[in-house]
């Protein structure tokens, strides 16, 4: 499978990404040297953010997202352009999570989700709340060590109430997960690294047991990371969907995590 290494600066004015090919099964390493003209799969880009929060990219190299080649199935690469608009191209590549649509200024608060068609009806364009992490590892190769937050009972995602507007930074993992659970969690839990503790304090159950509909959380990286648990397989592996995991802000992807790896994550129920 392709091995993807990224080096990003999520909050600054530029970022460099390098793509390297390989068949190793271990986690990919970060390429600190950026674009290599001798590598046909290497590229880099810079971006600027204008006053309206729109991203403007300048590419260098021979590689382009349209060349992305995973192992099988169907994959949609979503290119995030600003905080309110998504443009996307579909590729016959690795995932069945194939349609992400976000409708702004929608007057109804009803939300509808399923694995093949994620629709978020949201009225806000706020850029407050927590960030997520941008990762440089390939799909199934993340080794995580986390400290379990104290377990609490009283509230749950499945029976909770909508807390209101999504105040997390648009395009980040926290923003996606808040919408994915229908807003039935706190909107001011901060960075993803803080979510397990914030959830426990708010009365949600937090443990190391995955369950469909739960939130997977880790403190790994500068800001931590959260993802939505789509399903738990018979062998204990966990299928999650997530935003900003290796492909930049606004990009929704999915992956399967082994049972042994899943045991190192926190799960908010």
Swiss-Prot record:
Top-level taxonomic group: Bacteria
Record domain Peptidase C51: where: 148-269
Any one Pfam family match given in the protein's UniProt record, by short name: CHAP
CC per GO annotation: extracellular region
Keywords of this entry: Repeat, Secreted, Signal, Virulence
Region 7 X 3 AA repeats of Y-[NS]-N, residue ranges: 83-115
Localization in the cell: Secreted
Sequence repeats: 83-85, 88-90, 91-93, 97-99, 103-105, 106-108, 115-117
Signal peptide coordinates: 1-27
InterPro entries per the UniProt record, alphabetical: CHAP_dom (IPR007921), Papain-like_cys_pep_sf (IPR038765)
Summary of the function given for this chain in its UniProt record: Not known; immunogenic protein.
Protein name: Staphylococcal secretory antigen ssaA2
Organism of provenance: Staphylococcus aureus (strain MRSA252)
